[in-house]
Amino acid sequence: MADIDNKEQSELDQDLEDVEEVEEEETGEETKIKARQLTVQMMQNPQILAALQERLDGLVDTPTGYIESLPKVVKRRVNALKNLQVKCAQIEAKFYEEVHDLERKYAVLYQPLFDKRFEIINAIYEPTEEECEWKPDEEDEVSEELKEKAKIEDEKKDEEKEDPKGIPEFWLTVFKNVDLLSDMVQEHDEPILKHLKDIKVKFSDAGQPMSFVLEFHFEPNDYFTNEVLTKTYRMRSEPDDSDPFSFDGPEIMGCTGCQIDWKKGKNVTLKTIKKKQKHKGRGTVRTVTKTVSNDSFFNFFAPPEVPENGDLDDDAEAILAADFEIGHFLRERIIPRSVLYFTGEAIEDDDDDYDEEGEEADEEGEEEGDEENDPDYDPKKDQNPAECKQQ
């Protein structure tokens, strides 16, 4: 049995050596043809694949032999380049600090528009006919006859029901339209989120550590007494001394929620469960009531606390990572473009971006597959040499 294994291993090693010899000795179009044929043969041999995988696994986390073989004087120059890279990261950090200052400046310019949005949503201000005029995209245009029919239908519906104030359930609809947020919203959260009037972002003052606060403004409701719920995100825009090359712009370092003053019996983040326990000796049964945590959007305001040593278990790390993503998404996308998420247009744009990338990849894959599966395909007829893509 050992002889058979040794023989198979020798054959595998020989096959791998054949690949290396083809690369070293052959040149030109003939090399490409033979390499392609040999690659196909190897990919169909599970033993060769296993041997290749073993070799690749051995290369993980190991420096390239070329760098290790460089003369000492060259390595010194490489170190000089690394020091330049650190200085680049420090300049980049200053750049992002100025970007944060610009965000603070332009937030003041955006605010009157967001205030008007708030007033329209909450029936404080009724927009004029001119403000309500909107020219649809060409693809959305319909005939005058259909427009008139739709107008009559709308008028009938308006007569049948009471005139709604503002835009009902605006923010709840936004949340339900976005997968990242709808996953957080439970059925018992929806009656509360119907009372959400506005979401604002406030940036830290000039000269203060970089941070931003999300403010959720609620109208009086039967669930809690808070008028505003807040979530504060602390950020850092400087390279880490222990790993300066990992710097890629500002990062969220931590977050703090707020206490929700729930009215009696209205805390949706907790639920009461009842368990029956049977006494081993007497056989009597008793019912035990226990309060446990409950899935809810409002857990967003009670993130895991990061201990002083910074060590978190896997669950807490996953929760915080998702929390940071949600906070960033609310700040960068939802608050500035909420109406487009309400109508679904922003979601369609996002989907189109992903679809286009996916379609391009699919088309490339189909073309490659068609060539290999075509019995009349002759690689020699392909006169265009493979391009070398430099990253």
From Swiss-Prot:
The modification Phosphoserine is found at S10, S69, S143. GO terms for cellular component: cytoplasm; melanosome; nucleus. Disruption phenotype: Mice show abnormal embryonic neurogenesis. It is found in: Nucleus; Cytoplasm; Melanosome. A lipid is attached at C388 (S-farnesyl cysteine). The modification Cysteine methyl ester is found at C388. The keyword Cytoplasm applies. Residues 11-28, 131-143, 346-376 have a biased composition (Acidic residues). A motif (NAP1L motif) lies at residues 125-150. It comes from the Eukaryota. The modification N6-acetyllysine is found at K116. Polyglycylated by TTLL10 on glutamate residues, resulting in polyglycine chains on the gamma-carboxyl group. Both polyglutamylation and polyglycylation modifications can coexist on the same protein on adjacent residues, and lowering polyglycylation levels increases polyglutamylation, and reciprocally. The modification N-acetylalanine is found at A2. GO terms for molecular function: histone chaperone activity. Transmembrane segments: none annotated. Keywords: Acetylation, Cytoplasm, Isopeptide bond, Lipoprotein, Methylation, Neurogenesis, Nucleus, Phosphoprotein, Prenylation. The keyword Cell cycle does not apply. Its main location: nucleus. Histone chaperone that plays a role in the nuclear import of H2A-H2B and nucleosome assembly. Also participates in several important DNA repair mechanisms: greatly enhances ERCC6-mediated chromatin remodeling which is essential for transcription-coupled nucleotide excision DNA repair. Also stimulates homologous recombination (HR) by RAD51 and RAD54 which is essential in mitotic DNA double strand break (DSB) repair. Plays a key role in the regulation of embryonic neurogenesis. Promotes the proliferation of neural progenitors and inhibits neuronal differentiation during cortical development. The NAP1L motif is required for the histone chaperone activity. PANTHER family: TESTIS-SPECIFIC Y-ENCODED PROTEIN. This is Nucleosome assembly protein 1-like 1.
